[in-house]
Regions:
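Inter-helix linker motif
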Residues: 135-151
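Short, surface-exposed amphipathic charged segments that create phosphate/polyanion-binding patches used
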Residues: 150-162
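Short, basic interhelical loop/turn and adjoining N-cap
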Residues: 9-29
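RNase H-like nuclease fold core
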Residues: 26-118, 123-128
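Residue-level marker of motif borders
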Residues: 56, 137-139, 293
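Acidic/histidine-rich catalytic cores and adjacent linkers
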Residues: 67-68, 79-84, 100-101, 109-134, ...
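A structural signal for short, well-ordered beta-strand segments and their strand-loop junctions
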Residues: 13-14, 59, 116-118, 138-140
Length: 329
């Protein structure tokens, strides 16, 4: 049935068949779907498990299903059509102990099959995976690692912007007190200082070779005004380049070289990043064994969010989970 295979609203599917949406939903939910006889209904609000979908390579991530409540999703890296049979577990909550208790409901033999689990840097995920999949190694997703470094650079930019706004507000007040009209300093590209810092956000995410002419001009002015931000930008590019390596040993060497530069730069935000990365370093370096990422989990989460958005929110959580099972498990 289309409802079982399409992550769409009942109203959209009903309009396709030219029937009333409420009639279709009532008929599907109570007559043909099997929802009333669902074998996981008694514990659906707490967890759902699908041991038959376990493979050697898994991903674990969290997603908000309803009213901001977070659920933990364990999925395989099934590349089949529309992520069919990709869900291994759906767990209400993100607490390590709760995740572990649910995963341990899957028989030990199946859990020992798992060789690799990719994830973000969340400590709770790491603890749950370590205790539940004892034969597996954990791989921290490169996207989350690089984003942490880039966030540190952007934090510097935002702090500088707020400082520029504060200085401008003081200057405006002084001009007003002196019964003068405040005229902001306009830079050579037409930006004021606060505008320069606001409009530089996206160029800092890009490599120099990808800048437009206007972005290159803006970057030149930005780095002339704020040389420490230029240093942070260069350090960010160097860190991203580490992931071009195919050797774990070479990647570690480059990380240590990068760390030395961070210490020398004495940039507070980057010192904090180094401490975080060192805590997770072994799992970060595991990426270079098979270059595994959490991209499939992020893609799957996007599909769930899109499905939820189509429904304009989730009113019946159990029925929503039931439909997720039909679609993806």
């Amino acid at each position: 049935m289309q409802v079982d295979t399409r992550p769409d609203t009942m109203s959209n599917i009903a309009s396709y068949y030219n029937v009333k949406s409420k009639t279709l939903q009532r008929h599907y939910k109570h007559k043909v779907s099997g929802f009333k006889e669902w074998n996981q209904a008694s514990h659906a609000e707490d967890y759902l498990i699908y041991p038959e979908n376990i493979t050697e390579n898994l991903s674990i991530d969290e997603v908000s299903l309803s009213k901001g409540e977070l659920y933990t999703f364990v999925t395989n890296k099934n590349k089949g059509v529309k992520n069919k049979k990709c869900v291994v577990a759906i767990i209400n909550g993100t607490e390590a102990k709760v995740i572990q208790q649910v995963l341990e409901k899957i028989e030990s033999e199946k859990r020992l099959v798992v060789k690799e689990v990719s994830m973000d840097m969340a400590r709770n995920m790491g603890l749950a995976v370590k205790n539940s999949f004892q034969n597996s190694k954990m791989v921290i997703d490169r996207f989350h690692v690089v984003r942490l470094v880039m966030d540190a650079m952007q934090h510097m930019r935002v702090s500088l912007r707020w400082a520029a706004i504060k200085e401008e507000n003081i200057a405006i007040k002084q001009a007003k007190d002196n019964k003068q009209k405040y005229i902001a300093l306009v830079l050579s590209n037409g930006d004021t200082l606060r505008e320069l810092l606001a409009r530089s956000r996206y160029l800092l995410y890009k490599s120099e070779s990808d800048w437009t002419v206007n972005q290159a001009k803006r970057a030149s002015i930005l780095f002339e005004k704020y040389p420490l931000l230029k240093t942070a930008y260069k350090l960010t590019l160097e860190f991203r380049a580490i992931y071009k390596n195919i050797s774990k040993i070479k990647a570690l060497e480059q990380f240590n070289e990068w760390k030395t530069k961070i210490i020398a730069s004495n940039i507070e935000e980057f010192n904090t990043v180094v401490n975080s990365l060192e805590y997770h370093l072994d799992n970060i370096l595991n990426f270079f064994d098979n270059r595994s990422t959490n991209a499939n989990a992020e893609s799957f989460n996007s599909k769930i969010k899109g499905f939820r958005a189509n429904l304009r929110g989730v009113t019946d959580v159990n029925f929503f989970l039931f439909r997720l099972e039909k679609l993806f498990a």
